[in-house]
Amino acid sequence: PAFGVFLNNKIYDLTYQLGSGVSSLKEAIHFDVLPDNNEELEEYLAHVTPYTLADVSFLPVIPDPGKILCIGLNYEKHRVETKRPESEFPTIFTRFPDSQVAHRESVIKPSVSERVDFEGELAVIIGKGGKNISESEAMETIIGFSCYNDVSIRDYQRHTSQFTPGKNFSKTGGFGPFLTIFMIIFRPIYNK
């Protein structure tokens, strides 16, 4: 497996540019070696031969995350339509890594289900761990964002008060295709 940068409809492999010991996007995030500004990115790309999108096979953005924490009922209209009461705290459930599927792979409808729903979500990828992180420092832990199809197997989701049973069938969580680096987008805001 490798990872790279998507720019001008080409993919540039960064795996070897970042040096030995960095063989995945997860490791690049852990070792904090991703380019965090356009100048640094251009320097990396000057030494890399690009691939076309047709040349590559995708994996989920982070195929082996440590945790996948999801926020349920994350907008008011959905909470109202499901007739759930207001809560002071968010509804949190987990997904397991083996429930993920990559870009261009098919989501698989479980044969035991009659009710499968698409749920387009924003994945927020945390790059720095920690404990007791203040609200003012929370944004600094984010490495980037991606698309996530949080497919719900509704009939199983409703078997209990927990969402987890309906969210973890194999190949039901489309993750990707790309990670958008937070600081490349928001650096101008933070530098003001």
List where the protein language model places each region.
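Glycine-enriched loop-and-adjacent helix/strand subsegments that border the catalytic/binding cleft
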Residues: 65-192
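N-terminal non-catalytic cap/leader segment that marks the start of a structured domain
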Residues: 1-90
